[in-house]
Amino acid sequence: MNWRLLMTILIANLLCARGSAHGASSAPDPSAATGSQSSEAAITARLPTNTGGFATATGSDDSAVTVASLADLLAAFNARQHHILVKGEIYGGPRLTTVTFATTDWNNTTIEGASGGSAVLKNIQLKFDGEMLPAGKNIQNVVIRNITFHGVIRDLQALPAQVYGTSSNAGINYEGVSLRRVTNAWVDHCAFYDTSDDLMSVTLSSDRVTVSYSRFYFTSEWLTMHPDPMWNWAGKNQDLANERLAMLVGANRQDSYAYGGNRLHVTLHHNQFGPNLKGRPLLRGWIHAYDNYFDNGATPTGLTAAGSDETQYNALQIGSGGVVYSENNYFFRTNQSIQVGLDSPGDVYAFHENANRYDQTTGRSARGEVFSLAPVGYAYRAGTASSILKAVQTFGPR
């Protein structure tokens, strides 16, 4: 395989993709306001177009509608409110609540927490899902920011045995945010922990996504939960405490950059991954990851209540069809810091890196080549890997 030729083709495709039109966007729904027009401070009236990544999302121009309960949130959703401001903690109930945005009516949407960092969606998933749209159409221009997403362990333990593909699978599909067939999305200053699938995912030919200044981790209570229920994930039984996965970009080989139509351009910058992660992000897209902190400082080494190994199996995984450029990231005590895991032997992938720092890491780690061409076409400023330890305190909701 001529990897230099492959990379030239991949980067050329990237630049062509960036030069394409952003796509049409629909006007916000004029339905009557639900709840109250917000007197709470939104983070910004309108966000800048430079996200430090592939996204140029600005979200909604509408006035924000404040929601402070599950009833408020669902009423705002049913009224097609495009700018929702979350105030305080909202609980989705013991059986979990998924709010699904499934049509292009949801183009130009902002969901954000009020300033102060106290906005929480507990047992609630925000799912932007354009899977049923006509071919070539995605939901466009979505901003999610300044919110903490997390599950309630006792509620997940109390669910009936979860089996993939059955009616008892709400827990298996539970994430904080799921982006499916979404183009131009920005997830910023959020926190994700203790959800029973990946904490977040970007799949099904989504494109031009930036995830920034966010935290992804599991608590020690998750790691040591008892009872530790056994669930069936896609034909494989595994205990819940052992399902500690950060993020998925690209659902499978067919939903990857190289094999899925040169989509899934995703930037990850200024995020903290860990502690207590089993593994991932698993990356099958065209990924630029810079100034992230991969934190395995807790270094779990024991067994879960069901007898599974608590040890981290990787920190960042490159999957089939993925192109990953890792720049100025800090890996702290991570095990198998960067791992190549292909769906089939011989699948193409590419890994390039620059100025990463590996501090007290263990196990084998892939090593990347240096780019010979400019990897991205957007403006960004990468710091030094050592500066991330100071910057990490600015990550998460504010």
Where are these regions (language model features)?
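Extracellular beta-rich repeat passengers
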Residues: L282-R398
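Bacterial N-terminal signal peptides that target proteins for export
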Residues: M1-M7
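Extracellular "leader-to-stem" segments immediately downstream of a signal peptide or signal-anchor
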Residues: M7-T8, N13-L85, Y91-T97, R357-R398
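Right-handed parallel beta-helix
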Residues: N107-N108, E112-G113, K137-I153, R181-D194, ...
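Extracellular beta-strand-rich solenoid/capping regions of secreted or surface-exposed proteins
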Residues: L74-Q81, Y91-E112, A119-R145, G151-V182
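Active-site-proximal beta-strand/loop segments in catalytic clefts of secreted hydrolases
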Residues: L70, K87-E89, A114, I124, ...
